[in-house]
A protein has these predicted regions:
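Charged, alpha-helix-enriched surfaces in structured cytosolic catalytic cores
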Residues: 38, 42, 62-73, 80, ...
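Long, contiguous hydrophobic alpha-helical segments, chiefly transmembrane helices and signal peptides
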Residues: 53-57, 67-74, 95-97
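N-terminal intrinsically disordered, cationic/polar leader segments
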Residues: 1-42, 46-49
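Structured extramembrane domains adjacent to transmembrane segments
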Residues: 36-44, 57, 94-99
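N-terminal start-of-chain detector that recognizes signal peptides
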Residues: 2, 24-27, 57-58, 66-70
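Short acidic, S/G/P-rich loop/turn micro-motifs used as interaction or catalytic elements
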Residues: 35, 59-64, 103-104
Length: 122
């Protein structure tokens, strides 16, 4: 009897699939295309389904006016869905909109990083 199991074998994938089932929520990572535009088509529906949207504007750091246009589009999407936008970095180039029924801890986290003094030992 071998004490190690190859978790890549199909039998383990089948067992895991039976226990867990299909994912109901998804993460959508969006960044500007080659023409520096954001394709946000259908994202309002995805947010209403409870999906998470992360927008990376880091490729536009040399284009502040285009970055601002994209930020306004993200803000409009957030207003239409009634959800807040969170900046995940100090440069405000990594933005997040948490979908319906998602909770974001704004007390123990600053810019997406837990502050060690506020974490409990439980």
């Amino acid at each position: 009897n071998d004490s190690f199991h190859d978790l890549g074998k199909e039998i383990w994938a089948e067992r895991t699939h039976k226990l867990i089932g299909e994912a109901e929520r998804f993460v959508h990572y969006i960044k500007p295309d080659d023409l520096h535009r954001l394709n946000l088509d259908g994202m309002g529906h995805n947010l209403a389904q409870g999906n998470l949207v992360i927008v990376d504007l880091g490729s536009l750091t040399h284009m502040p006016s285009q970055q601002e246009v994209c930020r306004r589009r993200i803000q409009t999407l957030a207003q239409q869905t009634g959800l807040p936008v969170f900046a995940l970095n100090e440069a405000d180039t990594l933005l997040m909109i948490a979908g319906r029924n998602m909770r974001v801890d704004t007390e123990k986290h600053k810019l997406g990083v837990a502050q060690w003094s506020q974490l409990s030992d439980d």
